[in-house]
Amino acid sequence: MMESAISKPLVSIIVPVYNAERYIKRCVDSLRGQTLQNIEIILVDDGSKDNSGCLCDEFAQQDSKIHVIHKQNAGQGLARNDGLNIAKGRYVLFIDSDDFIEPDTCEKLSDRMEREQADL
């Protein structure tokens, strides 16, 4: 069965997470609050020693757009690659777990990419 274009996210947001218990809620809240609704959020728990992994699971239970990968610590680069392996979006945006973005960030970026027919 082919996935319809309607159900396929336009933007995949990948967030490598490592010991970000103090910051991850603000980050995820900023992603969940995007004006562009056609997104998926991939949280890659890179073997956190704090409560980050549990928080990621809680976010995924609250929102079907959020997917979580748990893995042994291997660094941010490999965590990003693991997120890319499951990303379904036409465009990919990487956000660090201690960052947050404005509500219209994904909408503005994707509008520009579509308008300019950007080929990356």
Which residues are covered by each model-predicted region?
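Nucleotide-sugar donor-binding/catalytic module of glycosyltransferases
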Residues: M1-L120
